[in-house]
Amino acid sequence: MNVMQENQIKLIAHIKQAVVQAVGLEEAEVPEILLEVPKDKKHGDYSTNIAMQLARVAKKAPRQIAESIVPELKKDNKLIKEVEIAGPGFINFYLDNAYLTDLVPVILTEDKQYGESDFGKGEKFQIEFVSANPTGDLHLGHARGAAIGDSLANIMKMAGFDVSREYYINDAGNQINNLVLSAEARYFEALGLDSEFPEDGYRGADIISLGKDLAAKYGDKYVHTSEEERRSVFRVDALAFETGKLRADLEEFRVSFDEWFSETSLYEENKVLPALERLRENGYIYEQDGATWLRTTDFEDDKDRVLIKSDGSYTYFLPDIAYHLNKLERGFDVLIDIWGADHHGYIPRMRAAIEALGYSPNQLEVEIIQLVHLFEDGVQVKMSKRTGKSVTMRDLIEEVGLDATRYFFAMRSSDTHMNFDMSLAKSTSNDNPVYYVQYAHARISSILRSGKEQGLEVTKDADMSLLQTEAEYDLLKVLGEFADVVAEAATKRAPHRIVRYLNDLASAFHRFYNSNKVLDMDNLEVTKARLALIKTAQITLRNGLTLLGVSAPEKM
């Protein structure tokens, strides 16, 4: 529990006692007291609507109730500096500044752990994201999903959730058959032999490279073997080649997974048919027109869904159900799937399947990643300058940099369309959001280095009561919000809230820096306090950037 949370608990307890004294209720009769941080700092550090909540019980106007509570609140409490009534009965609190300066040694001590909390209470979440077919390069939608999924996992972990990250490898189905046939054609081509390229084949440069690799590895060994033997071998090589490429690209993007789950393993370990039988036992399977159906309309889907076609082949839905059953059987409390915009219509049937399996539909959450459009100098960019083809994740990173790519993709809610301004992302000005935040970190690092050169080290023992300017208090207030912002971003599955916070923190630091001299050799005690203060800002900026997979540079 952080200092701010401790103060909130103390304040709530004090409000409860004031209500008991002023209104004459027993403690157990006092409704839950909610504290909000006013948007306008002129309205205090916290506000509560408890007087409105008590109006019916006390049979009085909320403002009248508030007027009876306030005198009790002012009694014997060092935390509160001032209390006022606003509007119809809101009670606004201004806290004593000592509660802010107490933050500094705490942040210095917690360092990389600052921002952590037990908010999630160890609840087990699995986040499955990216899960692109292993048949080509990652595109911009995958990149946005990767940035958001990885950031969300980092945020939820810091907020006290037990989080596992998973990539579902779609290594079964027609797309893999087409990959193998494409690799086979390029293999023959690399050997100088004629071969008909499959109509639905993959024509990317990576498949040409794969064909050359196969030719170099096997020579003409598989020219005269049976198709079955050749394609069986090439399937293994092609999947290893493509998944290896995906892993490398994601690793470069600072995205890691705890589990790479193979769709093929569902068949090899006989996980598909038991899922079907469970649905049948629960009474939601029926046969019609030679096909096997799942009655998802029982769970608000707009129509029932085919699981096995009349020719005996499975639809994509059946192994997807088996996969989600497997996840739940692994003991996760909640599954978060991060899907592309084209999967929006898939949500009702998947939630219906979860319920038909006997689980709560609330155990599946789906975050939709909306489309990304690239712009440069105000003009939409559709093709890569380098390849003349669609822009890939790799292309974008090479063009604007890894940090800018990660940060920009986290800036907007995932369910909104995104116009990615490459010109802005490459800009070295304060108009560039990631540059603005990173520059604040680098500037602090520079000041700390200068202080060290003059023999001044950051110490927890500095006299923090010397921090008395408005800009210092404003910076401390923003610093104190970090753990709550992390918990809120985790709860709302909203990495963009961390981006917003970092911008606010950088702004608060710049305001402080522009109005306060940090290194003042004629006033060493104040200098020591301010060095400690900016060190806490540096720590918090770094921790926030780390959540987003963005570096915190010492120099720029």
UniProtKB/Swiss-Prot annotation:
The keyword ATP-binding applies. It is an enzyme of class 6 (ligase). Its main location: cytoplasm. Its EC number is 6.1.1.19. SUPFAM superfamilies: Anticodon-binding domain of a subclass of class I aminoacyl-tRNA synthetases (SSF47323), Arginyl-tRNA synthetase (ArgRS), N-terminal 'additional' domain (SSF55190), Nucleotidylyl transferase (SSF52374). It holds the Pfam family Arg_tRNA_synt_N. GO terms for biological process: arginyl-tRNA aminoacylation. InterPro entries: aa-tRNA-synth_I_CS (IPR001412), Arg-tRNA-ligase (IPR001278), Arg-tRNA-synth_N (IPR005148), Arg-tRNA-synth_N_sf (IPR036695), ArgRS_core (IPR035684), DALR_anticod-bd (IPR008909), Rossmann-like_a/b/a_fold (IPR014729), tRNAsynth_Ia_anticodon-bd (IPR009080). It is found in: Cytoplasm. One of its GO terms (cellular component) is cytoplasm. Keywords: Aminoacyl-tRNA synthetase, ATP-binding, Cytoplasm, Ligase, Nucleotide-binding, Protein biosynthesis. PROSITE patterns: AA_TRNA_LIGASE_I. One of its GO terms (molecular function) is ATP binding. Belongs to the class-I aminoacyl-tRNA synthetase family. HAMAP family: Arg_tRNA_synth. This is Arginine--tRNA ligase. It comes from Listeria monocytogenes serotype 4a (strain HCC23).
